[in-house]
């Protein structure tokens, strides 16, 4: 949803409000788009991904989150003048001290960065590995068909594993994992 809105602001010069309205009319944004445009959906996703990647519970209330509602056409023009695009990014970093730094916010992304080419209804995840470097997974992320596909895949996965005795739960903990906003470093 946010990629679609930002793409329409960049390519068509639409205001945030006009791009959001268009996204809603096309079925890419909910009637109440708060979770998407305020970054809450991205925050939940980065919590899940960070927890899976780093084996630590990361909770939404531990992740500094800022959405795109404050992004203006002047911001878009400034980014373009610097050879960059504005993207809403969720980031999770496993620090050498074992803590996880996670945050969600609009970022200026270099045009040479593959993430700058992720536009419209597409999403991407970049994973950095010690041996392989950066790997980007890219695909549709907004609209009824990608959403329906993800839900069906989750239902099938749950049905396949109904008889297993392995349970994944969100127990207590996590407070020592996330880095407070004052400690977030530039990456």
Label for each model-derived stretch:
Residues 1, 42, 147-150:
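Catalytic-loop motifs flanking and including active-site residues across diverse enzymes
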Residues 6-10, 75, 139, 149:
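Short acidic, glycine/serine/threonine-rich loops at helix termini
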Residues 129, 135-137, 158:
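C-terminal transmembrane helices and immediately adjacent loops/tails
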Residues 133-135, 139-145:
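Glycine-rich phosphate/pyrophosphate-binding beta-alpha loops
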Residues 150, 155-187:
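A conserved regulatory-domain signal marking ACT and ACT-like small-molecule sensing domains
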